[in-house]
Swiss-Prot record:
Lineage: Bacteria, Pseudomonadati, Pseudomonadota, Alphaproteobacteria, Hyphomicrobiales
Protein's name according to its UniProt entry: Large ribosomal subunit protein bL21
UniProt source species: Parvibaculum lavamentivorans (strain DS-1 / DSM 13023 / NCIMB 13966)
GO CC, one annotated term: ribosome
Subunit note: Part of the 50S ribosomal subunit. Contacts protein L20.
Any one GO biological process: translation
Lineage: superkingdom: Bacteria
Cited function: This protein binds to 23S rRNA in the presence of protein L20.
Entry-linked InterPro entries: bL21-like (IPR028909), bL21-like_sf (IPR036164), Ribosomal_bL21 (IPR001787)
Length: 103
């Protein structure tokens, strides 16, 4: 059984015992969270599609750890104007383990 969940403005296809990296949205390591289910697939080709969410479907997950993504560099420049800006960014992420898909 699989589910398509939405978190952090992105969609992920998950199955039981998957570990994925999503944007941090609160909670501490070891906390249990529920995720929004957009689509739910089962054995035998059955598929439930939500509008926008599937009624009664839940994906339970556990926060494994908090991490940070790779550093990216933002550089802005306007030629001949002596305008240069250099900035860096690292996204806050968390590792999530899918415990159960109920639907």
């Amino acid at each position: 059984m699989f589910a398509v969940i939405r978190t952090g403005g992105k969609q992920y296809r998950v199955a039981k015992d998957d570990v994925l990296e999503v944007e941090r949205n609160g909670g501490e390591a070891g906390d249990k969270i529920d995720l929004e289910v957009l689509m739910l697939g089962g054995e035998g080709g059955t598929l439930k599609v939500g509008a926008p969410l599937v009624d009664g479907a839940k994906v339970k997950a556990e926060i494994v750890e908090h991490t940070r993504g790779p550093k990216i560099t933002i550089f802005k420049k306007r030629r001949r104007q002596n305008y240069r800006r250099k900035n860096g960014h690292r996204q806050d992420l968390m590792l999530v383990k899918i415990l159960d898909i109920a639907g």
